[in-house]
Structure formats: structure tokens, C-alpha cells
Amino acid sequence: MQSRYEPVFEREMGCTEAEWLGWLPAAVGACAWQRNGQSATVEVPPGALALRWETRPPRVIALMRMPVLHVHFTFSGLDDAQRYQFMRRFDLYMQRGGG
């Protein structure tokens, strides 16, 4: 989790598209969302979040292969505090492993 989220940013997720789509409903909580191919729009009152993703080649470390999903986040109509509040939940639901 970050202390601040810019209106537009990108990140790499260590998951497949199928995993991402399985986690997305819980990550956005009560916010309505709609998928369109490799993108989605999430209604985050009073604004919105546009997501775009693309599968990248996996990371290979010795015999381990980790999937890579490159995700673009574009917020509109939300201030810093509103973006932070949404992303705090989103990141907690998307977080895997750790330690």
C-alpha cells in the first residue's frame, strides 16, 4: 500500500488475467463496474476509475515462472483522499503472499 496515489499510474501485477478478473469484484467492493475486453470502468462516487491491462511475458527466475499483468489506472473526479480510500481496499484485496 502506498501513502498517495496519483490520478494516473501503472503497475505490474504478478498474476494471470483470469486471476485478476477473479479478484477484481472483491477488490472494488460495492462499486459498480463493467468489463470491456481488457479494460474495465469502475464507478467510484463521485468519480470513476478506468482500468486497462495487458499480459506481458512471464518473469523467469531459475526454474520459476511468474505471470505478469501490466495494469494502467486512470482516476477521474476523485481527490487525493478519495483515491487513497479506494486504493487502500483495492490493494488489500489484490495483495498476495508477502513476508
Residue positions per predicted region:
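Short secondary-structure junctions
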Residues: A27-G37
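A generic structural signal for short beta-strands and their flanking turns/coil linkers
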Residues: P7, Q38, G47-L49, P67-V71
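Terminal, regulation- and interaction-focused segments at domain boundaries
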Residues: M1-A27
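A common structural junction motif
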Residues: V28-G29, D91-G98
